[in-house]
Structure formats: C-alpha cells, structure tokens
C-alpha cells in the first residue's frame, strides 16, 4: 500500500468532522490528550471545535516512544507527559485521547494502561478518537 500524504486543509476538515462525531456521540470530555506528534494538531482542532460548541476541557499533549523508524518498532511503548493529567483526573471525569492514525493500537493501549494503573479507582471514562486508520495494521 502506498503511503498517503494528507494536506493541511484536509487534516483540519477531517479533524472538525472527528470533533463533530464526538459531539454527536454525546461524549463531553473535560480532558483531552493529543498524542504527540500527529495527534497534537488534531487534538487542538477537536478541543477548539468542542469549546465553540460549549464543551470546556483541559488539554495536553503526551508523547509515546515505540517507533525507531518507519515500520520499525521497539519492544515496548514508553509514555511521557502523563503526570499532569494523572494528578487532575477523578472518576467522574471524561477523557478523550486523540491521535492521528490508529495503527496497531499499542500506543493508545499503553497510555490507557498507564492512566488506569496510576488512577486506580479514580480512573475516568476514557474514549479514543482518530480520523484515520491503517486497515492492514490494526489489531
């Protein structure tokens, strides 16, 4: 399969559609995590769109390290930058994790695992949103 390059205007349009889908689902996140790098601009667009619709949220970017190069992975996923969110989250909160592409799901799974391990009984309702996916890689 040939690599697809997405133009900035298409990314913004797709990010707005993703935000609308979240809104229409009835899920109102009060925290949004954008997964650095690709998910950060999408997370910003989703947060701005939802804010315009009256849904206020705190938002941060977190980084994962899993890839050592294109299509080359390390053995485990490391997550960086969750401390602020973990200190803030309560069980009644709603967290939206935004990334650009759903690939294997391993990075998102590790973020969720780290949050649930740290928050224990204070783990919030967590949803994931991505505008794109790799059908041949998803697990």
Feature roles, as predicted:
Residues 1-139:
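PRPP-associated nucleotide enzymes
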């Amino acid at each position: 399969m040939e690599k697809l390059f997405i133009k900035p205007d298409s990314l913004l349009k797709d990010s707005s559609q993703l935000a609308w889908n979240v809104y229409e689902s009835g899920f109102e996140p009060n925290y949004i995590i954008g997964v650095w790098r690709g998910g950060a601009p999408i997370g910003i667009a989703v947060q701005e769109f939802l804010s315009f619709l009256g849904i206020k949220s705190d938002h941060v970017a977190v980084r994962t390290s899993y890839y050592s190069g294109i299509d080359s992975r390390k053995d485990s996923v490391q997550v960086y930058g969750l401390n602020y969110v973990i200190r803030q989250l309560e069980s009644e909160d709603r967290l939206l994790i935004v990334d650009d592409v759903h690939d294997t799901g391993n990075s998102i799974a590790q973020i969720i695992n780290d949050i649930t391990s740290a928050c224990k009984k204070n783990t919030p309702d967590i949803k994931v949103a991505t505008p794109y996916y790799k059908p041949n890689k998803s697990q």
